[in-house]
């Protein structure tokens, strides 16, 4: 599959854009995930500040705190086909904080979070240990495919 079959609507909704991964990076990370698919795929990637992420986490999951990544799968109406998988929302401040806290290079952690969120759109989860182990294995494989070391990357539980 070529990367032009993966269409990303990249929304930069955070105040500080300095140092964010560029569109080409997001495209390569997402394309690595969906390289096995032979059909057109679309998703929205939205980069937000902590205030918006806190609100989204509270509104949709009833958790009164911000988080690093949220995924919102799209389910088309019955009888309608759509290449849209859904939305992945990433919180800039939390991802940058985690990167420093875990001593992981920034680009590597951004890649991990977009991969993690995109896998949720495909139905992967980490609620129970067996699912978490599988999701972590898939994340590690994709991160390696993208050229990142994976010793410090684990799915958030």
UniProtKB/Swiss-Prot annotation:
<dbReference type="InterPro" id="IPR023091">
    <property type="entry name" value="MetalPrtase_cat_dom_sf_prd"/>
</dbReference>
<keyword id="KW-0698">rRNA processing</keyword>
<dbReference type="InterPro" id="IPR020549">
    <property type="entry name" value="YbeY_CS"/>
</dbReference>
<dbReference type="Pfam" id="PF02130">
    <property type="entry name" value="YbeY"/>
</dbReference>
<feature type="binding site">
    <location>
        <position position="126"/>
    </location>
    <ligand>
        <name>Zn(2+)</name>
    </ligand>
</feature>
<dbReference type="GO" id="GO:0004521">
    <property type="term" value="F:RNA endonuclease activity"/>
</dbReference>
<keyword id="KW-0255">Endonuclease</keyword>
<keyword id="KW-0378">Hydrolase</keyword>
<keyword id="KW-0963">Cytoplasm</keyword>
<feature type="binding site">
    <location>
        <position position="120"/>
    </location>
    <ligand>
        <name>Zn(2+)</name>
    </ligand>
</feature>
<protein>
    <recommendedName>
        <fullName>Endoribonuclease YbeY</fullName>
        <ecNumber>3.1.-.-</ecNumber>
    </recommendedName>
</protein>
<keyword id="KW-0540">Nuclease</keyword>
<comment type="function">
    <text>Single strand-specific metallo-endoribonuclease involved in late-stage 70S ribosome quality control and in maturation of the 3' terminus of the 16S rRNA.</text>
</comment>
<comment type="similarity">
    <text>Belongs to the endoribonuclease YbeY family.</text>
</comment>
<keyword id="KW-0690">Ribosome biogenesis</keyword>
<dbReference type="InterPro" id="IPR002036">
    <property type="entry name" value="YbeY"/>
</dbReference>
<dbReference type="GO" id="GO:0004222">
    <property type="term" value="F:metalloendopeptidase activity"/>
</dbReference>
<keyword id="KW-0479">Metal-binding</keyword>
<feature type="binding site">
    <location>
        <position position="116"/>
    </location>
    <ligand>
        <name>Zn(2+)</name>
    </ligand>
</feature>
<dbReference type="GO" id="GO:0005737">
    <property type="term" value="C:cytoplasm"/>
</dbReference>
<dbReference type="GO" id="GO:0006364">
    <property type="term" value="P:rRNA processing"/>
</dbReference>
<dbReference type="GO" id="GO:0008270">
    <property type="term" value="F:zinc ion binding"/>
</dbReference>
<keyword id="KW-0862">Zinc</keyword>
């Amino acid at each position: 599959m070529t990367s032009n079959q993966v269409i990303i609507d990249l929304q930069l909704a955070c105040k500080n854009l300095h140092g964010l991964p560029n569109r080409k990076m997001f495209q390569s990370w997402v394309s690595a995930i969906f390289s096995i698919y032979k059909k057109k795929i679309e998703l929205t990637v939205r980069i937000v500040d902590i205030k918006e992420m806190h609100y989204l986490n509270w509104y949709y999951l009833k958790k009164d705190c911000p988080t690093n990544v949220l995924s919102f799968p799209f389910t088309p109406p019955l009888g309608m086909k759509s290449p849209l998988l859904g939305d992945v929302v990433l919180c800039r401040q939390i991802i940058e904080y985690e990167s420093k806290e875990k001593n992981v290079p920034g680009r590597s952690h951004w890649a991990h979070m977009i991969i993690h969120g995109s896998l949720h759109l495909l139905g992967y989860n980490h609620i129970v240990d067996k699912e978490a182990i599988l999701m972590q294995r898939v994340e590690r494989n994709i991160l390696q495919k993208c050229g990142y070391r994976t010793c410090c990357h684990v799915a958030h539980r």
